[in-house]
């Protein structure tokens, strides 16, 4: 059963110090990291006891929306019923699209926006 629209459904960690982040979360929680390959920008699926629980990305050298470096951070993604329709609706309510929808194997489509205050959120 899909999660209700607007509820948390996924988390992502972006880190400029990928090795340090991996070591920390492996040691703290026993997480494992699986590189999804060049086609997906070396995005990594994070698993705990064989269950995929999060995503991870080495953001070192990737420019942010303002042109400066991306900061280390956790991003939260909210479930939507129709990603294209929700992005259009978000724009009508003052959102800015950071990244257009793309599809990830096993998890579905996602996009990043900022709300009118500048807070980033994933859909």
Task: Label each region the model flagged.
Residues 85-123:
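Hydrophobic alpha-helical segments and helix pairs
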Residues 8-12, 25, 31, 56, ...:
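Short, structured motif recognition centered on aromatic/hydrophobic residues
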Residues 2-5, 9-52, 92, 102-108, ...:
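Core segments of cupin and vicinal oxygen chelate
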Residues 7-16, 44-46, 64-89, 109-114:
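Vicinal oxygen chelate
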Residues 2-3, 64, 68, 96, ...:
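A generic structural signal for ordered alpha-helices
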Residues 59-61:
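A conserved beta-strand-loop-helix scaffold within acyl/acetyltransferase catalytic domains
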Residues 33, 52-54, 63-64, 85-86, ...:
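Short loop/beta submotifs within extracellular cysteine-rich repeat domains
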